[in-house]
């Protein structure tokens, strides 16, 4: 267990925090079974075997965070060490709430993670975006400054990344934003019902970013593999889910962006684009007000019914799903 590595096993104590690189070099250099030889950083699996023990984190969060952040910095020359540090950070985020309350420490953590999203090593980039997803989930109320300064741009770039694992995590970031803002909206409605002030405030990140992120999500719907497993989670499925959550947050505002995409692709010669158009239409059903939605469905129904006879099995499946949502 990782906590045994941190605490005195093999004569390693918490004084090792003074030399954090040593710890992560040890992780990166640990022998692997013959069936699993050492892999390049871009192919390294998650460091599940090194999950941090919650009890250790609660007691030693400052010292461990210092070591982790030092190893995760862009100045680190070993991608394996940086990846191990980012994995450790991901596991420790829940336990460093006091550090996130302090602006200087929070700024440094966010700087290190944001810089890691620009790493030339895919596994490091993926781990950095995984951290951003978790940070948004845990510390939404602290993210306004960072969204304005960096996260809007970084995550849009991430969604456009040609490496699907990077794009997937960038999409998950916005799904998390939407999840948080849906919860905040429900909380605000409940507070209003009792004539109270809500405990937390929404910064409406999704609404602000809508013109930038919605078109990217719609294009990601076209990135399907005809032979992919139906149950396999991929960028296209993640984009559809995110688009649905986005529609719930922004309501009618999604329509002006979705309709041109749907109309421009539903009769495309490329089955992927036809499928994406139908997926887009089905995904936004929970967003607009019922009156506007009724108008949309009435106008679109004849075209959607035509696609039940599409030569592509994938398109026919998506048509059936969309009709079930209408």
Over which residues does each language-model region extend?
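Acidic, Ser/Thr- and Gly/Pro-rich intrinsically disordered linkers and low-complexity segments
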Residues: 76-80, 194-197, 218-236
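Alpha-helical scaffold domains
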Residues: 11, 80, 91, 134, ...
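Hydrophobic residues within the alpha-helices of tandem HEAT/HEAT-like
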Residues: 1-6, 16-28, 43-49, 85-96, ...
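Long, polar/charge-rich, low-hydrophobicity segments
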Residues: 124-126, 153-154, 159-160, 172, ...
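HEAT/HEAT-like alpha-solenoid repeats
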Residues: 1-5, 31-73, 100-117, 144-158, ...
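Short inter-helical turns and helix N-cap capping residues of alpha-solenoid HEAT/ARM repeat scaffolds
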Residues: 8-9, 13, 76-78, 120-121, ...
